[in-house]
Amino acid sequence: MIEIKKAKPTSPGRRHVVSVKNTELHTGKPFKGLVEVKKSKAGRNNTGRITVRHQGGGHKQHYRIVDFKRNKDDITAKVERIEYDPNRSANIALVLYADGERRYIVAPKGLKKDMSVISGEKVDVAVGNCMPLRNIPLGTVIHNIEMKPKKGAQMIRSAGTFAQLVGKDNAYAIIRLRSGEMRRVLLDCRAVIGVVSNSEHNLKSLGKAGAKRWRGIRPTVRGVAMNPVDHPHGGGEGRTSGGRHPVTPWGIPTKGYKTRRNKRSNKLIVQKRK
């Protein structure tokens, strides 16, 4: 059961808090055999330089090893529990296969404890089941889509997202993404039936800066508040507008300027996003 709670304004930090509580989530620790130590990088690369700004601190986290390949075919898996995962917006499900192996999978919406899932070439079109795109009926809502066969899911993994299978053409399937983009994917690539869980994720409001810090996100300082050595908008006597069109700290135009590099997979885009 999903509960959306708005906090009472007992303090400035509580006034704007909106929390989403799922009473069906497991409240204990994660399964020990599928957890790894996650070292905090604080946005630094191997030379110690900051390559991603505004990262550092936050609560210590463990990485949950999630199965994105779903390559254990024709063996039924029973859902033991649905869990929170601090590393992604979606919830995850701990499943127990008939041969005794346990794995974490991204939980689709509607998947509950004691339900069963299965992956394979020809399995039922039911929520949580994984199969090649060639065996999925047109119009089906899908997620966790592979871009290359057997590489593992790379698209549609965030909370509440989904794509729709709209066509099949020779060796390719055509899928419509949430952005409106139409993309071709090989029919041998796998996908999971359904919508990704935790679709209420966007309704959350953290309410205060400290809640961001708990998540390892540091403050974002405006360029006009910096010195000229730190940003192209920096400096000036008194408050200024920056004196030029908005740019990044490295002088590249921002606010609508397209910076996406051409990729080899661009040729698979049938219709660009809106």
Curated annotation (Swiss-Prot):
The keyword Nuclease does not apply. PROSITE patterns: RIBOSOMAL_L2 (PS00467). One of its GO terms (cellular component) is large ribosomal subunit. InterPro entries: NA-bd_OB-fold, Rib_uL2_dom2, Ribosomal_uL2, Ribosomal_uL2_bac/org-type, Ribosomal_uL2_C, Ribosomal_uL2_CS, Ribosomal_uL2_dom3, Ribosomal_uL2_RNA-bd_dom. One of the primary rRNA binding proteins. Required for association of the 30S and 50S subunits to form the 70S ribosome, for tRNA binding and peptide bond formation. It has been suggested to have peptidyltransferase activity; this is somewhat controversial. Makes several contacts with the 16S rRNA in the 70S ribosome. Part of the 50S ribosomal subunit. Forms a bridge to the 30S subunit in the 70S ribosome. This is Large ribosomal subunit protein uL2. It comes from Francisella tularensis subsp. tularensis (strain SCHU S4 / Schu 4).
